A protein has these predicted regions:
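Short, glycine/charged-enriched hinge/interface segments at domain edges or termini
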Residues: 74-169
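N-terminal glycine-rich anion-binding loops that anchor highly charged ligand groups
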Residues: 14-24, 38-53
């Protein structure tokens, strides 16, 4: 990824398309026209051009980069083990929920290895804690807006080798 700062006079829909925004872009009334982290398509680029701004900060995705949502989805799928499912994405985090009543088992060593990777965060309830169906037992998050696919692949391999980082038995 590469960070760029675009001046309004140099901006066009073509120049904006594909960029990832570093912050919300608002119209004159204060309404968000394009949210932080959005990867601009033609329609979003046109909306951004219609908003009042002088300089726009964004990220250019390069080959081998993943957007935070795609990377987070992959992370979440790798983290879940037996008795846990990916529930949904909200607030930049993927919720992981129990599919049955039981005790939460956390693979602590692999979890520590995963969390040692810059830009990756997986946080859980306590190992051995009783949980109910539908209860969120962990959350997975990719903190940068764009991350190297290699980092995500390493984490996937660690989590899968452990049979998932969180399980309900």
């Amino acid at each position: 990824m590469k960070a760029v700062a675009l001046r309004r006079e140099a901006a066009s829909a073509e120049a904006l398309a594909g960029l990832v925004l570093c912050y919300d872009v608002r119209d004159a009334g204060g309404r968000i026209v394009a949210a932080k982290g959005a990867r601009l398509d033609a329609a979003a680029a046109a909306a951004v051009l219609g908003a009042p701004w002088e300089e726009l900060h964004a990220l250019v995705m390069e080959p081998g980069d993943l957007h935070e949502e795609e990377a987070g989805a992959r992370l979440a799928r790798a983290v879940v083990g037996e008795g846990v499912e990916v529930k949904g994405y909200t607030g930049g985090q993927w919720a992981l929920a129990a599919t049955r009543r039981g005790l939460l088992t956390v693979a602590r060593e692999p979890l520590t290895e995963v969390n040692a990777r810059e830009g990756i965060s997986v946080f859980t309830l306590f190992d051995g804690q009783p949980v109910e169906p539908g209860e969120v037992v962990a959350r997975a998050k990719v903190t940068p807006l764009v991350i190297a696919a290699d980092v995500v692949a390493e984490v996937e391999a660690l989590a899968r080798a452990a049979g998932g980082l969180v399980r309900v038995r």
